Regions:
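C-terminal motif of bacterial Sec signal peptides marking the signal peptidase cleavage site
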Residues: 18-21
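Bacterial N-terminal signal peptides that target proteins for export
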Residues: 2-11
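Short, compositionally biased
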Residues: 93-99, 146
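Short beta-strand and strand-turn-strand segments in soluble, beta-rich domains
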Residues: 107-115
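Short aromatic-acidic-glycine turn motif
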Residues: 97-108
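Extracellular/periplasmic metallocenter environments
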Residues: 23-38, 63, 114-161
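N-terminal edge beta-strand
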Residues: 42-77
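Beta-strand cores of secreted/periplasmic/IMS beta-sandwich domains, seen most often
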Residues: 67-92, 127-136, 160
Length: 161
C-alpha cells in the first residue's frame, strides 16, 4: 500500500524550507577560524581610524560596481556595500576575508566588533559597512553566491598589495 502524505504537510514543509533558504545569510565568527588573521584586536587597535579610506561598492542585479578593488596592506578602509538591486546579494570572498583584520561590520541591525567574515548578505535596499585593515597580499575572487548570480556575471577580483 503506497504511503500517502497529506497535502498540508507537504505545503508546510515546502514553506519552511523556503523560509530557511530566503533568510539572511550574513555569517561572521567571533573567533577567527583556521586560516584567518589571528591577532585582529591588536592590529585594529593600532590603526588611526580617522584616516580610513572610503570605498563604495554598489550591488545590483548581476554586477558589482566596481568589480575590481585594490587595497594597500596596513591601510585602514571603510568599505560601504550598497545593495541597489531588487533582491538580496552577497559579497563573498573567502580568500580576502582570511587576509584582512576586521574592526567592525555595521548593518541596520547594529555593529559587530572584530568579526571574522565568512559571508556578507546584503538585502535589497540595505547598506552595510565593513571597517578593515588588509594584512596579507594577494588577489582574491569575489562573487555573489545567490543562486545563478555569479553565472550571470556577478563576479570580480580584490587585490591587496
Amino acid at each position: 500500500m503506497p504511503l500517502r502524505i497529506p497535502a498540508r504537510f507537504v505545503a508546510l514543509l515546502f514553506m519552511t524550507a523556503l523560509a530557511v533558504a530566503c533568510a539572511p545569510r550574513t555569517d561572521v565568527a567571533q573567533r577567527p577560524p583556521p586560516g584567518y588573521v589571528g591577532d585582529v584586536a591588536p592590529r585594529v587597535a593600532a590603526v588611526d581610524w580617522t584616516q580610513a579610506r572610503p570605498v563604495t561598492v554598489q550591488l545590483s542585479e548581476f554586477e558589482f560596481q566596481p568589480n575590481r578593488l585594490t587595497f594597500e596592506r596596513g591601510t585602514p578602509y571603510r568599505l560601504t556595500l550598497e545593495n541597489r538591486g531588487n533582491v538580496a546579494h552577497t559579497f563573498t570572498s573567502e580568500g580576502f576575508f582570511k587576509a584582512i583584520a576586521v574592526r567592525r561590520v555595521t548593518t541596520p541591525q547594529g555593529p559587530v566588533e572584530t568579526p571574522a567574515l565568512v559571508n556578507l548578505e546584503i538585502p535589497a535596499g540595505q547598506t552595510d559597512v565593513v571597517e578593515f585593515v588588509p594584512v596579507q597580499a594577494g588577489t582574491y575572487e569575489l562573487a555573489c553566491h545567490e543562486p545563478l548570480h555569479s553565472s550571470f556575471g556577478m563576479t570580480g577580483a580584490i587585490t591587496v598589495r
